[in-house]
């Protein structure tokens, strides 16, 4: 069982058994994400695989898509909209939904010049994004979109501040709940997805986690 699956099961039982889009209008998610899971979902291989795939794709888009340069897209709310559509979907349907979602965020230009220069010298990659090339899991279309997105031209990203040798990550604040408020499944998954992707994308000691 993968580290992600173990974290996911623990989380599910915590407290319960170029041209980008115009400004998005989202439902009011302040009181609830509107998404819940039941106890059986923690044992369903389809659900677990869908949630892991969604976590990876969502986080990859968060840190790579040029649409994240401003406040047009609220990436957390995008997740809340995707969860009910993806969680019980078949693999082909899931991949179609995710591929269409990325396309809806807007077109982007690709520049592989840096990668070509990097491949010509000896180097060590701290983080492994080879999973985007897994066409068995992602299908050819989604895999190609993510592979292109890896080299998308982006002037800035509101979730990542690059200050020379220092990288700072930013996330949108949670609603101001009472201290004893129990987050629903959507918000708990958001917490896990944020942590997972921050480590997977930027942790220099990933092999030790």
PLM regions with names:
Residues 1-24:
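Bacterial Sec-dependent N-terminal signal peptides
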Residues 21-209:
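Flexible, low-complexity junctional segments that flank or bridge functional domains
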């Amino acid at each position: 069982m993968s580290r992600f699956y173990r974290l996911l099961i623990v989380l599910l039982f915590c407290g319960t058994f170029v041209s980008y889009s115009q400004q998005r209008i989202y439902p009011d998610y302040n009181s609830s994400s509107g998404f819940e899971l039941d106890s059986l979902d923690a044992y369903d291989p389809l659900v677990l695989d869908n949630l892991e795939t969604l976590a990876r794709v969502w986080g990859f888009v968060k840190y790579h898509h040029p649409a994240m340069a401003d406040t047009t897209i609220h990436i957390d709310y995008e997740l809340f909209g995707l969860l009910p559509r993806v969680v019980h979907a078949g693999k082909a349907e899931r991949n179609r939904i995710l591929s269409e979602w990325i396309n809806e965020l807007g077109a982007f230009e690709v520049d592989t010049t840096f990668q070509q220069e990097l491949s010509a010298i000896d180097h060590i990659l701290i983080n492994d994004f080879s999973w985007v090339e897994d066409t068995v899991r992602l299908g050819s279309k989604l895999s190609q979109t993510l592979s292109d997105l890896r080299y998308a031209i982006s002037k800035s990203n509101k979730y990542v501040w690059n200050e020379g040798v220092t990288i700072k990550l930013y996330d949108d604040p949670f609603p101001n709940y009472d201290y004893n408020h129990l987050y629903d499944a959507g918000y708990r998954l958001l917490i896990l997805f944020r942590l997972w992707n921050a480590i997977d994308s930027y942790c220099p000691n990933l092999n030790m986690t």
